[in-house]
Swiss-Prot record:
Protein name per its UniProtKB record: Tryptophan--tRNA ligase, cytoplasmic
Species of origin: Rattus norvegicus (Rat)
Keywords recorded for this protein, A-Z: Aminoacyl-tRNA synthetase, Angiogenesis, ATP-binding, Cytoplasm, Ligase, Nucleotide-binding, Phosphoprotein, Protein biosynthesis
GO CC list: cytoplasm; cytosol; nucleus; protein-containing complex
Localization per Swiss-Prot or TrEMBL: Cytoplasm
Family, similarity comment: Belongs to the class-I aminoacyl-tRNA synthetase family.
Chain positions with N6-succinyllysine modification: K158
Summary of subunit composition and partner proteins: Homodimer. Interacts with oxidized form of GAPDH.
Main location: cytoplasm
Length: 481
């Protein structure tokens, strides 16, 4: 694929070999113990992904009992090489053994994207005339593909549009789910462009133990939370895959074109699919790719095929869009541009991202003030010392403290955040005080969101989800003849 990283692997082959052996043992033990099918399939996917990484690094297939030589470049006892092998990121799994979380600099190299640097942030500020969002200022959105092309288009008064999405797997969304929508709302405001939001209820039906009716009902409930973020109904189209596929021939035609240009071998290598996966899973990446092309939305862009889109998303979704970027020029479309965010850590620590399937790892948008306080106090991983005396003497570690991490996402004032960092690091602020600060930020944030959501009616949802013409700044440029 054109956009796959081509540099040297960041992983020690010996460490990767050992990981494959250990994962193989896990798969065998799960099968022998008659573990749930989903658990076995997840383990098998991880095994195949590890083997693919090994083949890329070594140029040959993994062979059990035949470890690579220990003199491979990059091993040499380098702790960074070992750490890289312990970071695992794909669209379904995020895992690291480091309490600091994923090494995003190495992930940029691994995925072949570009770092969002100060120069790019300054250019965004000049183009929009607006102060950069805190997610940009603090490196929460840290990586991109072709953002300079988007800015070129904007500065030359050429149109582009935003595309993001949500896989609705439960009625309640959590704080981590808010991150891309908060940022996308800011992008919509400062660039004054249309936005399409894909609700991939078909994906959740294929991957989860859900009925079609349940998957669609989650779409409607999640759409209410998304609308409550403040999107402009005149510039925003939210669509259900289950619903829109039958309403838009242009959308389905793009899905079929993508399917024709991507082989099973490619998607197996990208996503780790196995022979036991249903064909719906294998073909789904084309459905997630299709909104990247403007003529998938004829009510908005008519038959224009040349309007580029910008996709804000977490970096675990990048494999879908590396595939999309490879296909785009072959079917007559510009490559989508991307802005990648870091992961929102679980309460228990940055080794994994927040998950809706674990209520103790997540703060939900439906939680009460009492529940928020209890979860932060009981479950938020602390970077503090074992005793007050030690903490006062040596200070806390903000790099692993979840409460501080959450404040970097949600506390707007940079000076206040920096003062908290200094106080906690010096020992002047205790863990309990830091957690109280976070609670004082989260409780009103979620209460205000709940109030906005309560005002979202079924009619409001229908209005956002109706295929229709949108109103936006560059509309006249889209339809000039």
């Amino acid at each position: 694929m054109a956009d796959m990283p081509s540099g040297e692997s960041c992983t020690s082959p010996l460490e990767l070999f050992n990981s494959i052996a250990a994962q193989g043992e896990l798969v065998r033990s799960l099968k022998a113990g008659n573990a749930p099918k989903d658990e076995i399939e997840s383990a098998v996917k991880m095994l195949l992904s590890l083997k693919m990484n090994y083949k890329t690094a070594m140029g040959e297939e993994y062979k059990a009992g035949c470890p690579p030589g220990n003199s491979t470049a990059g091993s040499n006892g380098d702790p960074d090489a070992t750490k890289a092998s312990e970071d695992f990121v794909d669209p379904w799994t995020v895992r690291t053994s480091s309490a600091k979380g994923i090494d995003y600099d190495k992930l940029i190299v691994q995925f072949g994207s570009s770092k969002i640097d100060k120069e790019l942030i300054n250019r965004i500020e000049r183009a929009t005339g607006q102060r950069p969002h805190r997610f940009l200022r603090r490196g929460i959105f840290f990586s991109h593909r072709d953002m300079n092309q988007i800015l070129d288009a904007y500065e030359n008064k050429k149109p582009f549009y935003l595309y993001t999405g949500r896989g609705p797997s439960s009625e309640a969304m959590h704080l981590g789910h808010l991150v891309p929508f908060i940022f996308t709302k800011w992008l919509q405001d400062v660039f004054d462009v249309p936005l399409v939001i894909q609700m991939s209820d078909d994906e959740k039906y294929l991957w989860k133990d859900l009925t079609l009716e349940q998957a669609y009902s989650y779409t409607v409930e999640n759409a209410k939370d998304i609308i409550a973020c403040g999107f402009d109904v005149n510039k925003t189209f939210i669509f259900s895959d289950l619903e829109y596929m039958g309403q838009s021939p242009g959308f389905y035609k793009n899905v079929v074109k993508i399917q024709k240009h991507v082989t099973f071998n490619q998607v197996k290598g990208i996503f780790g699919f196995t022979d036991s996966d249903c064909i719906g899973k294998i073909s789904f990446p084309a459905v997630q790719a299709a909104p990247s092309f403007s003529n998938s939305f004829p009510k908005i862009f008519r038959d224009r095929t040349d309007i580029q889109c910008l996709i804000p998303c977490a970096i675990d979704q990048d494999p879908y869009f590396r595939m999309t970027r490879d296909v785009a020029p072959r079917i007559g479309h510009p490559k989508p541009a991307l802005l990648h965010s870091t992961f929102f850590p679980a309460l228990q620590g940055a080794q994994t991202k927040m998950s809706a399937s674990d209520p103790n790892s997540s703060i939900f948008l439906t939680d009460t003030a009492k529940q928020i306080k209890s979860k932060v106090n009981k479950h938020a991983f602390s970077g503090g010392r074992d005793t007050v005396e030690e903490h006062r003497q040596f200070g806390g570690n903000c790099e692993v403290d979840v409460s501080f991490m959450y404040l970097t996402f949600f506390l707007e004032d940079d000076d206040s955040l920096e003062q908290i960092r200094k106080d906690y690091t010096s020992g002047a602020m205790l863990t309990g005080e830091l957690k109280k600060t976070l609670i004082d930020v989260l409780q009103p944030l979620i209460a205000e969101h709940q109030a906005r959501r309560k005002a979202v009616t079924e009619e409001t949802v229908k209005e956002f989800m109706a295929p229709r013409q949108l109103s936006f700044h560059f509309q006249c440029f889209c339809f000039d003849t």
